[in-house]
Amino acid sequence: MPFPVTTQGSQQTQPPQKHYGITSPISLAAPKETDCLLTQKLVETLKPFGVFEEEEELQRRILILGKLNNLVKEWIREISESKNLPQSVIENVGGKIFTFGSYRLGVHTKGADIDALCVAPRHVDRSDFFTSFYDKLKLQEEVKDLRAVEEAFVPVIKLCFDGIEIDILFARLALQTIPEDLDLRDDSLLKNLDIRCIRSLNGCRVTDEILHLVPNIDNFRLTLRAIKLWAKRHNIYSNILGFLGGVSWAMLVARTCQLYPNAIASTLVHKFFLVFSKWEWPNPVLLKQPEECNLNLPVWDPRVNPSDRYHLMPIITPAYPQQNSTYNVSVSTRMVMVEEFKQGLAITDEILLSKAEWSKLFEAPNFFQKYKHYIVLLASAPTEKQRLEWVGLVESKIRILVGSLEKNEFITLAHVNPQSFPAPKENPDKEEFRTMWVIGLVFKKTENSENLSVDLTYDIQSFTDTVYRQAINSKMFEVDMKIAAMHVKRKQLHQLLPSHVLQKKKKHSTEGVKLTPLNDSSLDLSMDSDNSMSVPSPTSAMKTSPLNSSGSSQGRNSPAPAVTAASVTNIQATEVSLPQINSSESSGGTSSESIPQTATQPAISSPPKPTVSRVVSSTRLVNPPPRPSGNAAAKIPNPIVGVKRTSSPHKEESPKKTKTEEDETSEDANCLALSGHDKTETKEQLDTETSTTQSETIQTATSLLASQKTSSTDLSDIPALPANPIPVIKNSIKLRLNR
């Protein structure tokens, strides 16, 4: 006989009379006693992660939202009086704060912010919200960090109310008054609204619809808490970077609840992984059949919209206008998530068989052990305020870079870690704020090739051009906002990242290397033949000037740390405010990784052997020929940029190593930094280094910035480069992989 079950705050579960979802349930089985015990164990496992808020804190949130709601009502009455509405209308004019997102779903964590929507009647304008209501908030003692973002895609007021972060959207309905029992799911409310109000309403409408489409809200909430924690721990929780955001995870869990309406959380977590590890993407996930609504708004429909047919992992919002919440998902991010679903299924299989504990599901795999090759992106700005804006823009475009990388014929997977990290300062004496992202790469196996040359120049350059162009067009760009990119091997990451994120890594021979502050003299990226690419600011490089093709920065020629062999030189990513023509090649280890597994691999900790290391000094080019301006700058013939070269042995490769030597040195040998004068130098010409010094280059850059700081804010959003172009620098990140 099935055991009745009561979960936290829920009533006894009975077989549902109502049909949920677009298909019949897979199973109507009621929970067993073992399921109840596993669910209780799941709750106990979740508690230390802070996914449950204390009752006292929850009451505090309710109190704050009550104060905010009263402020809205008071403000709307004042607006109504100022617009001479009849007293009878003013007394019942209403106005209300609605919540959405994780708080409305009931799955918010400790310290999480609140997403809120201010709903006002038709006589209250958006301009009133961003003026008089903003001023009213400013007068409140509890309100701190008040800021308005009126020009955003979804305009918002952000604030901290008595220690709780709140984002408030605004929607004006075509109603004379706002009743207390207003149901925002009513499609007729969307009539005669402007698009910004429709967007603002969408969050509440979707959240409310989800809660009405699950059989048991308490079981849904506990399952969603577990899945969200799992996704965050496994670094696949980020809509902006091409993974899934909170609403998408909620819809996947809701669909699981529909398919197993009587199951409780322990079963639902397992069924979640079962369903979506076997889901035949790109078949869409739908919580209900889309309903026709004659409001002429664009909806997700691949039968009508050709672009919708290219969505890889569609999860469709249940409220009109239906949208795909996962349009950012790429081939790589879907591959990573599906692999994580499969691993989640394997672990929950073990848990249900009492072969593992729930804690195993929430163990964080070490991203920095999964791959042999990484691209590190660095964004820097001179002030903290500028850094926040710059980092936001760069992060929003990283998925474009991932999409470009995965189209490279030699790349199987480009996996960006959603976590960003503070980057070590380039110059400890200079005020600079730097943020770093890491992208793991898996290269395809190729047969009949000892060495594979992979050129990532075009992919990186297209990305940086896009970011700079948007920054200038949106009038956000400031001098000294920079992006740098470099290729790094797994064993070098300890020189860039905090030690706590690399704790699963074997100890390196790094005596004498200090992680913080980390300047160029303590960062040696050459021991594994890595290449770097540095992209200058778009306001620089307006005139012909000496080039520093090595891309090095102050401190480059200072003594290397103890970890490096004496014969190995530094090659690293820096931001150089001058146009460059830089092509680099390197030989690395084999790259036959499969899709990342949860299990970590031991890091290679052997220092490079000087006997097998071959050093070719970087060449700096003095007095280059003048570069054409305008669009011509982007059309300079360059045999490297954009060419997807086939694999071919390098003619001057060092003798083939034995298997033992290969294991120890394949990631350590042959440092090449090729730079060119019209790309015509031979290898023999590269064995010299000119006398141009970095200090001279920096002085030249400084003088150029001072004299060439011209307004770029009138750029139109067109593909062609403006007259004073964002420099399309033919820098190069090229890898030569030993087979």
UniProtKB/Swiss-Prot annotation:
The modification N6-acetyllysine is found at residues 635, 644, 730, 734. Binds 2 magnesium ions. Also active with manganese. The record marks 153, 158, 328, 399, 524 as: Interaction with RNA. Keywords: Acetylation, ATP-binding, Isopeptide bond, Magnesium, Manganese, Metal-binding, mRNA processing, Nucleotide-binding, Nucleus, Phosphoprotein, RNA-binding, Transferase, Ubl conjugation. Mg(2+) 2 binds at residues 113, 115, 167. This is Poly(A) polymerase alpha. InterPro entries: NT_sf (IPR043519), NuclTrfase_I-like_C (IPR011068), PolA_pol_cen_dom (IPR007012), PolA_pol_NTPase (IPR048840), PolA_pol_RNA-bd_dom (IPR007010), PolyA_polymerase (IPR014492). Changing residue 730 to Q: Weak binding to KPBN1. Cytoplasmic location.
